[in-house]
Amino acid sequence: MLHLHILSWVLAIILFIATYLNISKNQGRSPFFKPLHMILRLFMLLTLISGFWILIQSFMNGGANHMLLTLKMLCGVAVVGLMEVSIAKRKRHEQSHTMFWITIALIIITMVLGVILPLGPISKLFGIG
């Protein structure tokens, strides 16, 4: 399940950037916008479902850091929401660059939290998890 989660969020980030850049300020949406946005939503849903499943498994094992897991879950849900809001603002031709960079910053924070959690590579490297 962890591999599905990692694959889905990597593809979601790539699709988010592609979808965001497929909206021109002068010409509007490109013909590829709608399919990209739908595929992005699919991968965001896969990311949320697999992340929730990993959260449940970690809570059941008992040895996990529950506060960091909950914080990462909240950051992940916020990332999904900010992705949708920044794309919607861009689609309506509103100022969306600030929202885009806030989303990117929150993606990085969420990734750092994922790296230091018990299933992350830092914990596996030092034998903590």
Curated annotation (Swiss-Prot):
Protein's UniProt keywords contain Transmembrane helix: yes
Give the organism, scientific name.
Staphylococcus aureus (strain NCTC 8325 / PS 47)
Where it mainly occurs, coarsely classed, is: membrane
Superkingdom of source: Bacteria
InterPro entries given for it? UPF0344
Subcellular location field: Cell membrane
Family, similarity comment: Belongs to the UPF0344 family.
> Known Pfam families for this protein?
DUF1516
Query: This protein is called what?
Result: UPF0344 protein SAOUHSC_00907
Q: Which GO terms describe its cellular component?
A: plasma membrane
Provide the transmembrane region boundaries: 1-21, 36-56, 67-87, 99-119
Provide the membrane topology annotation.
Multi-pass membrane protein
Keywords on record: Cell membrane, Membrane, Transmembrane, Transmembrane helix
- Record has Ribosomal protein as a keyword: no
